[in-house]
A protein has these predicted regions:
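Zn-dependent metallo-beta-lactamase
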Residues: 1-37, 208
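Flexible, charged surface loops at secondary-structure boundaries
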Residues: 6-7, 28, 34-37, 57-61, ...
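A contiguous pocket-lining binding segment that forms or flanks enzyme active sites
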Residues: 98-132
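Metallo-beta-lactamase
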Residues: 3-5, 16-19, 39-47, 119-205
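Generic beta-strand structural signal
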Residues: 32, 63-64, 85, 114-116, ...
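Active-site HxH/HxHxD metal-binding segment of metal-dependent hydrolases
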Residues: 45, 49-112
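Active-site-flanking structural segment that lines cofactor/substrate pockets
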Residues: 24-56
Length: 208
């Protein structure tokens, strides 16, 4: 079952079970992929029968895709092969989950096509969130999560020293939407501000 949800004009998501999820993990089996205009973020291909996603992509063919974190490779190779997208992301990946596509390196401070801004989250997990100015949206892989609906920062040993200062810097951007891969995917600026004041989620030794 794939859920398709509109967030704002031209900004939408599809949400589905991750095929590699195993019981007992520290992340929700339902994961989200995001589309902003012709840009995709962490795309996971839905089954062929889920026509709504594929029809939307046919109507507005993607031109670029971003892998936001080394363990979010998902189906980037398929989208490169089928749509000819320019693919951006890390240069280092987990063994056994290395894309065949040679991604263009995206690092904090870069500006990608369409004015997308690559950001720093302070967690030291090689994640590069992206700000989409046209849609006033921040898109995260794992830096924030919402396993029970409430937006939380994913824990690290240096939450206070590094992560919170980096995330607070993002408040200088005029974003309205905060999008996260795991748990409830769509949040507001107020939710983001509140998350910075809450206790972080999960174990500090997590790979997320």
């Amino acid at each position: 079952m794939v859920e398709v949800r509109d967030i704002a004009p031209g900004l939408w998501l599809w949400r589905q079970p991750h095929p590699d999820w195993e019981p007992g993990g520290d992340w929700d089996p339902m994961v989200s992929s995001f589309a902003a205009g012709t840009a995709l973020f962490d795309p996971l291909a839905p089954p062929p029968a889920e026509r709504e996603v594929w029809d939307r992509l046919a109507q507005t063919p993607p031109e670029l895709a971003v892998v936001l974190k080394p363990d979010h490779v998902r189906d980037i190779d398929l989208f490169v092969r089928w749509y000819g997208v320019r693919a951006f992301g890390p240069v280092l990946f987990w063994p056994g989950d290395v894309p065949k596509t040679r991604l263009e390196f995206a690092q904090p401070g870069d500006e990608l096509p369409g004015g997308l801004q690559v950001l720093h989250d302070g967690r030291g997990k090689a994640e590069t969130p992206v700000y989409v100015p046209e849609h006033r949206a921040l898109v995260f892989a794992d830096a924030l999560t919402a396993p029970h609906g409430e937006l939380l920062v994913w824990a690290t040993p240096w939450h206070e020293e590094r992560v919170l200062p980096a995330l607070r810097e993002l408040l200088a951007l005029p974003f309205e939407h905060v999008l996260v891969s795991h748990g409830e995917p769509v949040h507001t600026r107020a939710d983001f501000e509140a998350a910075l004041e809450r206790e972080p989620w999960g174990d500090t030794d997590s790979n997320a």
